[in-house]
UniProtKB/Swiss-Prot annotation:
This is Cell division control protein 2 homolog D. Gene3D superfamilies: Phosphorylase Kinase, domain 1 (3.30.200.20), Transferase(Phosphotransferase) domain 1 (1.10.510.10). Plays a key role in the control of the eukaryotic cell cycle. Pfam families: Pkinase. Keywords: ATP-binding, Cell cycle, Cell division, Kinase, Mitosis, Nucleotide-binding, Phosphoprotein, Serine/threonine-protein kinase, Transferase. It comes from Antirrhinum majus (Garden snapdragon). Its EC number is 2.7.11.22, 2.7.11.23. Residues 14-304 form the Protein kinase domain. GO terms for biological process: cell division; G1/S transition of mitotic cell cycle; regulation of G2/M transition of mitotic cell cycle; signal transduction. One of its GO terms (cellular component) is cytoplasm. The modification Phosphotyrosine is found at residue 25. It is an enzyme of class 2 (transferase). Belongs to the protein kinase superfamily. CMGC Ser/Thr protein kinase family. CDC2/CDKX subfamily. InterPro entries: CDK, Kinase-like_dom_sf, Prot_kinase_dom, Protein_kinase_ATP_BS, Ser/Thr_kinase_AS.
């Protein structure tokens, strides 16, 4: 009975202030810890009807987050609380540090005023993103769902942190087959769109490239509304790939004969980005995944030379 009491009172430590979102696996609240007055984000995980105990997806997420939380550019998991809902089912609350905005809202605020994000701020955010991604990859974890919405930010300090590792999966070499129902379409790498079942860290770097371009222009680089349209957006800018450009492309499950486009200069899609930035962007947008720049290498790119990296 004491056990029951501790479960239901696990959440008495917090006051829920407002619902701030809906993650892959459950609701997210802004809450206050009663004992300290500290503001936190509570992620309540939804357990399926037929599940006894905690779903393996959640356990995986918790163990990954505990490991990755050491990096300043990954959102910090402060605690895990177990409680019970009204029906008496077990509910898990993940307690995260609270960040006041995300990159999607940040970009939208500039779009609304018609202003551009200062080039040095783009550079700082991109460096932090590459640093966080390099940390995840260095620990054998692919995020697989990087997009502005799950990059949290502190507007005052311009600190960026990667969140929603709900779909992240530790990859061990040789890289296993993955389900390809992942990633918001706009940030989805071409190998995923074409049905590749072996992914590498390069899928995240494609997403990073799309986020980079969006920071500069406040517009999605490839805003497709279906998998086919998404591919055609990519082909129109980068040219339709072939075996010469991307060996093995025609053997991918969803490869068909596509309209033939020739590559356009990337600068046409990202006006306002300087030469070093365009070079880095093109290094991230290679069709062949093995040629795409890694996050670690990207951090050493001349584009970041003028950036003051102390404190990042």
């Amino acid at each position: 009975m004491a056990e029951e009491k501790s479960k239901s009172s696990a959440m008495d430590a917090f006051v829920k202030l407002e619902k701030v979102g809906e993650g892959t696996y459950g609701k997210v609240y802004r809450a206050m810890e009663k004992s300290t007055g500290k503001i936190v984000a509570l992620k309540k995980t939804r357990l399926h009807e037929d599940e006894e105990g905690v779903p393996p997806t959640t356990l995986r997420e918790v163990s990954l987050l505990r490991m990755l939380s050491r990096d300043p550019h990954v959102v910090r998991l402060l605690d895990v609380k177990q409680g019970q809902n009204k029906e008496g089912k077990t509910v898990l609350y993940l307690v995260f540090e609270y960040m006041d905005t995300d990159l999607k809202k940040y970009i939208r605020s500039f779009k609304q005023t018609g202003e551009s994000i200062a080039p040095m701020n783009v550079k700082s955010l991109m460096y932090q993103l590459c640093k966080g991604v390099a940390f995840c990859h260095g620990h054998g974890v692919l995020h697989r769902d990087l997009k502005p919405h799950n990059l949290l930010m502190d507007r005052k300090t311009m600190m960026l942190k990667i969140a929603d590792l709900g779909l992240a999966r530790a990859y061990t070499l040789p890289i296993k087959k993955y389900t390809h129902e992942i990633l918001t379409l706009w940030y989805r790498a071409p190998e995923v769109l074409l049905g590749a079942t072996h992914y590498s860290p390069a899928v995240d770097m494609w997403s990073v490239a799309c986020i980079f371009a969006e920071l500069v222009t406040q517009k999605a680089l490839f805003p497709g509304d279906s998998e086919l349209q998404q591919l055609l957006h990519i082909f129109r800018l980068l040219g339709t790939p072939n075996e010469e450009i991307w060996p093995g492309v025609s053997t991918l499950v969803d490869w068909h004969e596509y309209p033939q486009w020739t590559a356009q200069p990337i600068s046409s899609a990202v006006p306002g980005l300087d030469e070093k930035g365009l070079n880095l962007l093109s290094e991230m947008l290679h069709y062949e995944p093995s040629r795409r720049i890694s996050a670690k290498k990207a951090m050493e790119h001349p584009y970041f030379d003028e950036l003051d990296k102390s404190g990042l």
